[in-house]
Amino acid sequence: MDKVIFMVDMESFFASVERANHPELSGRPLLVSGDPERRSGVILAACPVAKARGVTNGERLWEAQQKCPEAVVVRPHMQQYVTVSVQITEILERFTDLIEPFSIDEQFMDVTHSQRLFGAPREIAQKVQQAIWHETGVRARIGMGESKVLAKMACDNFAKKMPSGVFHLTKERMERLLWPLPIECLYGVGRQMTKYFRNQGIRTIGQLANTSLERIKGKWGVNGHVLWLTAHGIDPSPVTPHSHDKQKGIGHGMTLPHDYVKAEDIHVVLLELCEEVCKRARRAHLMGRTVAIGVSGANMETPTGFHRQMKLTNHTNITMEVYEGAATLFERFWDGKPIRRLHVNLSNLTSDEAWQLSFFGNRDRAHQLGYTMDTIKEKFGDTAIRRAVSFLSASQAEERAKKIGGHYK
């Protein structure tokens, strides 16, 4: 039996969930923006009607409103999106246990052996679409192929543009349908890689596919090899339900509301990020021994900042121990330029069961205190108990507690 893999993608996911929750908005263009009160906020999602007017995700709200002035603008509700995403996963699991989340609104399915129960691939796709629509009010588009990359490209380049929302891209159809497309339509090719390819005279997927592998590997190494295979629809990776289960690191970052220029202000946010990282580590019963921090400025055209890591004395999930390492890195490598984004990561993980008592300090007490604080926050909210520094003007703890994934709950 030929392998059949689906890429199931939700149409304008955030906007679709908002519309399903607010039937009174039916028929009106809808935009989801991080901060509707600020015209400088960015578009997180736009309904198909707004997209047809030229609105794109990531553009400024005021620009979108010029293109679609009658659009209703709503604030995102990330907790609701997460809930619906989980609900959709449960729907997909009725058809196969081989489900691999790709993002909050995209999932791979291997339905190879589901055909005996649910019919041909297109029939299964239609049943999946109907179930998702009836239970969530969200429309799904489904790309089909014998590999994950074929399914992904079938979805992005064809299914999203078809009334049925379903498209099967076989290897036999690649040369006729996929290869004439611009090189940027190839999965894995971003803006920078598009420039590189175009400078080399490679403007279509077919031109890449027909370029010798030796030339591609010689110029772009392993990444070029992978893209050449993708252009041929070759991807041996299976749909793996638990591929994201084992964590290699626990990180947390945030974009600041304005440039931070004072070291004492940056230290406040750095401590709060370490608090969040350690809370997540304790929740997973993990400890880490390598701490890394990354900082950057607001101007992406002329990047500033650094990314450095160091090994700690012990595996830990104690906030102050991780913070001491992060603070050391910051003081050592910060050049004094304004900072707009910070990130803290804890890696080299091991089980919390390996905790070693220290008879010459207060490590065990601090270790238990962390879990006690977590229990209080779980019961009464993240702002129920805070460090004193979180009451300073530089603190972002209270604002961050209102958000999931950087957006309001």
Swiss-Prot record:
The record marks 14 as: Substrate discrimination. GO terms for cellular component: cytosol. Keywords: Cytoplasm, DNA damage, DNA repair, DNA replication, DNA-binding, DNA-directed DNA polymerase, Magnesium, Metal-binding, Mutator protein, Nucleotidyltransferase, Transferase. Binds 2 magnesium ions per subunit. InterPro entries: DNA/RNA_pol_sf, DNA_pol_Y-fam_lit_finger_sf, DNA_pol_Y-fam_little_finger, DNA_polymerase-Y, DNApol_IV, Rev_trsase/Diguanyl_cyclase, UmuC. The active site is at residue 106. It holds the Pfam family IMS. Its EC number is 2.7.7.7. Its cofactor is Mg(2+). The keyword rRNA-binding does not apply. It is found in: Cytoplasm. GO terms for biological process: DNA-templated DNA replication; error-prone translesion synthesis; SOS response. SUPFAM superfamilies: DNA/RNA polymerases (SSF56672), Lesion bypass DNA polymerase (Y-family), little finger domain (SSF100879). Residues 5-190 form the UmuC domain. Mg(2+) binds at residues 9, 105. The keyword RNA-binding does not apply. One of its GO terms (molecular function) is damaged DNA binding. It catalyses: DNA(n) + a 2'-deoxyribonucleoside 5'-triphosphate = DNA(n+1) + diphosphate. PROSITE patterns: UMUC. It comes from the Bacteria. Poorly processive, error-prone DNA polymerase involved in untargeted mutagenesis. Copies undamaged DNA at stalled replication forks, which arise in vivo from mismatched or misaligned primer ends. These misaligned primers can be extended by PolIV. Exhibits no 3'-5' exonuclease (proofreading) activity. May be involved in translesional synthesis, in conjunction with the beta clamp from PolIII. Monomer. HAMAP family: DNApol_IV. Belongs to the DNA polymerase type-Y family. This is DNA polymerase IV 2. It comes from Halalkalibacterium halodurans (strain ATCC BAA-125 / DSM 18197 / FERM 7344 / JCM 9153 / C-125). The gene is dinB2.
